[in-house]
Amino acid sequence: MLKKINLFFYLFYFLFFSSWSFAGERNDKNLLTFGAGLWDWNDSQTAGLFNFEYRHGTRYGPFKPMIGGLINTDHGFHIYAGIRMDLYLTDKIVITPSFAPGFYERGDGKELGHVVEFRSGLDLAYRRKNGARIGVEVHHLSNASLDENNPGTETYLFTYSIPLN
């Protein structure tokens, strides 16, 4: 039990305190991100996926706001707003966990059980000298049991982020 508590505190320190100094040393710009990948890739209702996202460069504590939307080839879409946290492994490699609640319309695709869906994810990106990023992202969408029907879905995307300022 003590080992689990110690592990929790080390993880907490790394995510919240060390990331502040890493992200604070960067002059991050606002980013416009485009992505393409697969929706529900680990299930029988796989569809193509396209994503568009605005990522604000200003930090509020360790977090940066984002807003975006995705549409799949089954005419379903998810519009969301949330937070991200850049964790720099090196000057060029960035890992970014994110969380965003949003509104979901299924189209002809998978029924996720509720109009409100929460997107949690992780992306890994290579940051170029001009601030642009090339990356890969994985996400899970779920209604967090707001409805009895809560199958969730997984997505993955290849992304390109363009610095805006």
Residue ranges and their predicted role:
Residues F22-H56, P163:
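Outer-membrane beta-barrel initiation region
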Residues N30-L32, R59-K64, D91-I95, N130-V136:
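Repeated loop/turn-to-beta-strand initiation elements of outer-membrane beta-barrel proteins
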Residues G35-W39, R55, L70-N72, R84-D86, ...:
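Outer-membrane beta-barrel pore domains and translocons
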Residues G48, A125, P151-N165:
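Outer-membrane beta-barrel "beta-signal"
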Residues N51-R55, G82-R84, D123, T159-S161:
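Outer-membrane beta-barrel architecture
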Residues H56-Y60, T73, L87-I93, R127-N130, ...:
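Outer-membrane beta-barrel strand-turn architecture
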